Amino acid sequence: RRLRIDNTSLSIFNLSPGTNGPQVQIECLNSTTHLQPLPDKGKGARMILVRHGETDWNKAGRFQGQIDIPLNEHGRSQAAAARDALSTIPIDRAWSSTLSRPTETAEIILSDHPGVPLLQIDGLVEIGHGLWEGKLESEIRADWAELLEQWKQEPETVKMPDGETIQDVWARSVKSWKKIASSLR
């Protein structure tokens, strides 16, 4: 099976119980042609991660972060392509951040899976870019050239002005993923 969705990410993780915690198999990162055939799913869960479709700010190169920018038409067509790719895959639960772009992406995908609940989780929102949100890279460079270069080279060392660090995002998202994982048992 080959899955490729323009400018979108679709990843599949198979989780199964292990003696030292869950065992994870990565099934797909847009193309599975390089992988060996999968064994039967067996016990455990399969998680499909889909990045939201394009927005006008993505297209323009603006830092979005936590500003709630909706999908554009191309983003909706990307979500429809993900829906089509996943139409025959059984889905029994779905999660999204509380922002409209991932929520709409999920709703479009779930239109082929009626009755599947979509739970929104605050902790899954994107990194808060603070004062950089809504700005083009050239605008950020004008005021924060050194910090922008550091962000490109070592993002884990940067706290954007009035924004979050990678560690902040990690802490809140891990809590959310643990909540999701515990609901799969």
How should these model regions be labeled?
Residues R2-L49, G130-E139:
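Acidic, low-complexity terminal tails and accessory targeting/binding regions
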Residues L3, I69, V158-K159:
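Helix-turn-helix-type domain boundary/helix-start signal
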Residues I5, S11, G21-Q23, A80-E149, ...:
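Phosphate-coordination/substrate-recognition cap region in phosphate-metabolizing enzymes
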Residues G42-V116, D143, E164-S173:
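Active-site-proximal alpha-helix that buttresses catalytic centers in soluble enzyme cores
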Residues N58-K59, I127-W132, T157-P161:
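A short acidic, helix-capping loop that chelates divalent metal ions and anchors anionic groups
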Residues L147-D168:
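Short glycine/proline- and acidic residue-enriched helix-loop micro-motifs
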Residues S183-R185:
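Short, intrinsically disordered, charge-balanced linker/junction segments flanking boundaries
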